[in-house]
Amino acid sequence: DEKILIHVSNFRPVKRVPDVIKIFSVVRKTLPSKLILVGDGPERSECERLCRELGITEYVKFMGKQDSLPEILSIADLFIMPSQSESFGLSALEAMSCEVPVISSSVGGLPELNLHGKTGYIAEFGDVERMAKYAIELLSNEKKYQLFQKNARARAEIFKDEKIIGDYEKFYEKILSE
């Protein structure tokens, strides 16, 4: 049973896409899995090179920009968001609304959205080993995984209202710019 890990971003340094690839590389050694990378941006070619370097090219799919994110998220088992800066984490919220648990960094609004040990796991940004460990732990425990799926969906429902999301984004941008 192959696991699908996913990351969605603009491939800018702040999103730490190389960390996503390194996390996946560790997970892949333990669990049969694939990585889907959605989006495009300045670090894409570096990320493609890293996949070649790690010998995982055949397991990583670069999808470019996509319009139908829910369709892609519906096949995912885990959403990886190791950003070093994030105001809110809308793509993580979208994943959670599709019952996809999240492994994220602890920056910006992510800890408010992704509840550690309930909807996914949180680690310090840059801690590739810990994020990989959490991913393996969650994907290896079906009972816990199903609970996290339900929790992620329920948590996303709280934030679903467009107005709330807009308010949170403004709030976090204000806080982060101070």
Task: Enumerate the predicted regions with their spans.
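A conserved nucleotide-sugar
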Residues: E2-I6, V17-F62, K144
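Aromatic "clamp/platform" in nucleotide-sugar-dependent glycosyltransferases that forms part
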Residues: K65, Q84
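A short alpha->beta transition loop at the rim of the catalytic pocket in nucleotide-sugar-dependent
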Residues: P70, D77, E99
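Short glycine/serine-rich donor-binding loops of glycosyltransferases
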Residues: G89-A92, L110
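Short hydrophobic beta-strand element within catalytic cores of glycosyltransferases
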Residues: P101-S104, N114
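Conserved acidic donor-binding segment of nucleotide-sugar-dependent glycosyltransferases
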Residues: H116-G117, Y121-V128, E137-E142
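A short, well-ordered alpha-helix in the C-terminal region of glycosyltransferases
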Residues: R130, E137, K144-I158, K170
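C-terminal alpha-helical cap of glycosyltransferases
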Residues: D161-E178
